[in-house]
């Protein structure tokens, strides 16, 4: 994984930032990404019309689930992983299990079937400090009331709704 930073005085394709605060954008490029992913062509219209190749939503869901299960931040959690997990399930996006398995093998030297993955996920969901999860994501949520339903049980029930591709 290679990292670089764009600062507020960096010109990239004539992009500049007009803000009072200093803006930094971290860009990471995975030079050896896990394989068995799926892509699709998408048309974007701004700043001008162009076609781009991107990961499919099921493949992105696999990356998010890998992060949710394996991300190690000592005692901290990343609330955005939980928010995104809810988003994928809410939008009925199937999970690309083949890519998830490839990620676990490459980064964690683990092989598992769907049942074992769901067990690992449920353990993570049950053990998390949900107040810490909420506190981490709160600054990014427009309506804090959305988080009132969040509980360990809520996420365990979401896990039962995962569809596999």
Regions of interest found by a model, annotated:
Residues 1-165:
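Structured mid-to-C-terminal alpha-helical surface segments
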